[in-house]
Amino acid sequence: MAIFDIEKDELLRFSDTQLEELIARLAEAEIAAHGHSPAYVHWSGSINAPDGGIDVHVQVPIEQMSTGFIERPDTIFQAKKYPMPRAAITSEMITDGALSPTISEQAAKGGSYIIVSLGDDCSPLMKRDRLKAMKDVITDDPNRSNIHLDFFDRSKLVQWLRQHPSVMLWAKRILGQGYSGWQPYGAWSNPPQGSVDTLISAPGVTITLPSGKGQKLAIQDAIGPMRELIRSTNKAVRITGL
């Protein structure tokens, strides 16, 4: 197994709240990889907080989005730790005998609704049956043709996880399999307690990039080129200095 890899069955050890956080972190990483702010991902972080059928909500202010894992700019993820057969899917999508208002709203605005089931590991036939169950629930909705529906099982979830090594590091740490010397994204600057942790952008603090021919950039002007360099290069990237 590669150093940054994980077996899909290891994810079964995640709790409900950890599963929800995993999906949120993956959604943040996914839209960030496509040039959008992680701030467009919303989640409660608590399974006890009223959520109206929403565990993780992606709302990117663009007309279209298709990344392979997120197919609409407005996407709702519903996290489920246990298997979701047809009856469970129907129960999840129906409220008081009618289609959940949350799902109906997604259909009205052409959004996406995705159930993520950690307890399922589907064959193609099993996934097809679950998608059919989801589509059957919305049969009577006038906007049923507008909504994008999907069902992520454990294999799909780990496939997504493998695309984002930083989230993989977090997941491995949660499972007690962290790597010595490796840390996921976090507040590394470790500011004194009570102080404001802001980006250093004072005059005189500059960044020089290999492709910049010695040009000195202010930090706020260098962030975009640095991100592009990290995305495009096949070489190791090391940031030195303060």
Region spans (language model):
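Mixed-charge (Asp/Glu-Lys/Arg
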Residues: 1-241
